[in-house]
């Protein structure tokens, strides 16, 4: 069994302000019990050693492997495999099944959701950007999470001039 990324158990009324980004997937034993008022937030690096990528590839469905292969760049293929593989490992723990047994259905825009068989047990969401992936899990409600890599933008004023009103530009300054 693969070791897992870092986890925070977050009460719904609290926010995680600063998260350390692990560069390896490590974890000691964890409680995968979600109370009605908990949200679990997991964080992992998409940069994983080849041996981990190989292990995660083995638990993906054939559809997921095909989707990964459609990415033109190898680093995007690896990122998809790592993000989806870790999702399967985490869901396997929450659902008490093997990661390869997790079944997804897909919304029209391609977002994965648990198949009907497991959908009532846990709700999840994931977001990835640059080298980081975040996962959120809840047992009592639909959940979302978002992460965005912050990068310098030298042409920010030019972008604003083309996309925002004069009032919006003034508020940005």
Regions found by a protein language model. Give the residues of each.
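Core catalytic alpha/beta fold that binds nucleotide/phospho-ligands
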Residues: 2-173
């Amino acid at each position: 069994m693969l070791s897992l990324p870092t986890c925070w158990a977050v009460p719904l009324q609290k926010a995680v302000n600063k998260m350390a980004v692990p560069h390896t997937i490590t974890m000691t034993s964890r409680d995968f019990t979600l109370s009605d008022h908990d949200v679990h937030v997991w964080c992992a690096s998409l940069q994983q050693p080849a041996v981990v990528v190989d292990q995660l590839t083995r638990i993906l469905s054939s559809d997921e492997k095909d989707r990964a292969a459609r990415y033109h760049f190898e680093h995007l293929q690896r990122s998809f495999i790592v993000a989806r593989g870790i999702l399967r490992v985490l869901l396997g723990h929450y659902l008490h099944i093997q990661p390869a047994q997790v079944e997804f259905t897909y919304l029209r825009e391609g977002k994965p959701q648990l198949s009907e068989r497991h959908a009532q047990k846990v709700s999840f969401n994931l977001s990835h950007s640059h080298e980081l992936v975040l996962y959120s899990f809840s047992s009592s409600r639909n959940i979302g999470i978002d992460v965005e890599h912050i990068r310098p933008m030298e042409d920010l004023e030019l972008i604003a001039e083309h996309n925002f009103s004069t009032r919006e530009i003034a508020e940005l300054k």
